[in-house]
Amino acid sequence: MAAELSMGPELPTSPLAMEYVNDFDLLKFDVKKEPLGRAERPGRPCTRLQPAGSLSSTPLSTPCSSVPSSPSFSPTEQKTHLEDLYWMASNYQQMNPEALNLTPEDAVEALIGSHPVPQPLQSFDSFRGAHHHHHHHHPHPHHAYPGAGVAHDELGPHAHPHHHHHHQASPPPSSAASPAQQLPTSHPGPGPHATASATAAGGNGSVEDRFSDDQLVSMSVRELNRHLRGFTKDEVIRLKQKRRTLKNRGYAQSCRYKRVQQKHHLENEKTQLIQQVEQLKQEVSRLARERDAHKVKCEKLANSGFREAGSTSDSPSSPEFFL
């Protein structure tokens, strides 16, 4: 592509020349840097293959294998040229044709050989997490692996002073990690149903105690349904049945209270009426005594008047005289 771009301004415009240029397969040529660029950066292809943040001490059969690579660290080096990317990709495919099917051991060797391919590095990250978890329980197992020393060194200086916080600082587990490490990733967080069931399970004994009897009776149905969100159906039914029982009990108590109040009122009225009847009876007896007294008096007056009339019967003014 770079060759086509560089040849663009110098191409002739005749059809024969264009057909001659099109006969060439330019894609089979490797893209290389200019000699000036190579003179400015000698030995860069050897160090360009090394990924940022990695250490390498064992060379492989690379074009630069004649000069052993020393441990170097290049975290801030940036790849700004497209030609370097093409050159690295083609060079890695020539040296490692089975890059897509690497095992963790091959990934370790590829990492030591300074080949920046993302997929083998991901496999190596999973292998590194499993190995470091094994190293946490057994202090000296890393001598059995050829690249375990590099894998352990890549954890950084924070692995040794914070060894007791290993599980918090370890990389996220992958398919090669233990099931105990995969448990937090398989369950990222409780859903709404899990939260509701956990709330209901945590308050099984206190669901009915959450609301007092007065609150259940005085609360409206809409407000009660809003407070009962998150509880199970059985608990809601049981709480509503308790509310219905309390309302029926309250209604029965109010009816009983009304009946008692009415009974007391009737008893008071009865007592008052009885007292009035007694007063009336006393009045009747008093009137009867007065009547008897007046009757006796009238009889006495009548008897005394008849005697006076009998004494004067001989006179012409008496009534018997005219008869």
Curated annotation (Swiss-Prot):
- Covalent link location (Glycyl lysine isopeptide (Lys-Gly) (interchain with G-Cter in SUMO)): 32, 297
Q: Which GO terms describe its cellular component?
A: nucleus
Compositional bias ranges of the Basic and acidic residues kind: 34-43
- What information about domains appears in the record's comments? The leucine-zipper domain is involved in the interaction with LRPICD.
Q: Where in the cell is it found?
A: Nucleus
Residues of the region (Basic motif) are 238-263
Which residue ranges does the record assign to the bZIP domain? 238-301
User: Ranges of Basic residues compositional bias?
Assistant: 129-143, 159-168
Annotated stretches, region: Leucine-zipper:
266-287
State the residue spans of region: Disordered: 34-78, 116-210
Keyword Signal in record = no
Outline what the protein does.
Acts as a transcriptional activator or repressor. Plays a pivotal role in regulating lineage-specific hematopoiesis by repressing ETS1-mediated transcription of erythroid-specific genes in myeloid cells. Required for monocytic, macrophage, osteoclast, podocyte and islet beta cell differentiation. Involved in renal tubule survival and F4/80 maturation. Activates the insulin and glucagon promoters. Together with PAX6, transactivates weakly the glucagon gene promoter through the G1 element. SUMO modification controls its transcriptional activity and ability to specify macrophage fate.
Query: What is the official name of this protein in its record?
Result: Transcription factor MafB
Q: Which cysteines share a disulfide bond?
A: none
The record's GO molecular-function terms, alphabetically, read:
DNA-binding transcription factor activity, RNA polymerase II-specific; RNA polymerase II cis-regulatory region sequence-specific DNA binding; sequence-specific DNA binding
Q: Which Gene Ontology terms describe the biological processes this protein takes part in?
A: abducens nerve formation; fat cell differentiation; negative regulation of osteoclast differentiation; positive regulation of DNA-templated transcription; regulation of DNA-templated transcription
Q: Which UniProt keywords apply?
A: Activator, DNA-binding, Isopeptide bond, Nucleus, Proto-oncogene, Repressor, Transcription, Transcription regulation, Tumor suppressor, Ubl conjugation
InterPro entries recorded? bZIP (IPR004827), bZIP_Maf (IPR004826), bZIP_sf (IPR046347), Maf_TF_N (IPR013592), TF_DNA-bd_sf (IPR008917), Transcription_factor_Maf_fam (IPR024874)
Q: How is it modified after translation?
A: Sumoylated. Sumoylation on Lys-32 and Lys-297 stimulates its transcriptional repression activity and promotes macrophage differentiation from myeloid progenitors.
Q: Which family does it belong to?
A: Belongs to the bZIP family. Maf subfamily.
Can you state the subunit structure given in the record?
Homodimer or heterodimer with other bHLH-Zip transcription factors. Binds DNA as a homodimer or a heterodimer. Forms homodimers and heterodimers with FOS, FOSB and FOSL2, but not with JUN proteins (JUN, JUNB and JUND). Interacts with PAX6; the interaction is direct. Interacts with ETS1 and LRP1. Interacts with the intracellular cytoplasmic domain of LRP1 (LRPICD); the interaction results in a moderate reduction of MAFB transcriptional potential.
Positions with biased composition (Low complexity): 54-76, 192-201
Any one Pfam family here would be Maf_N
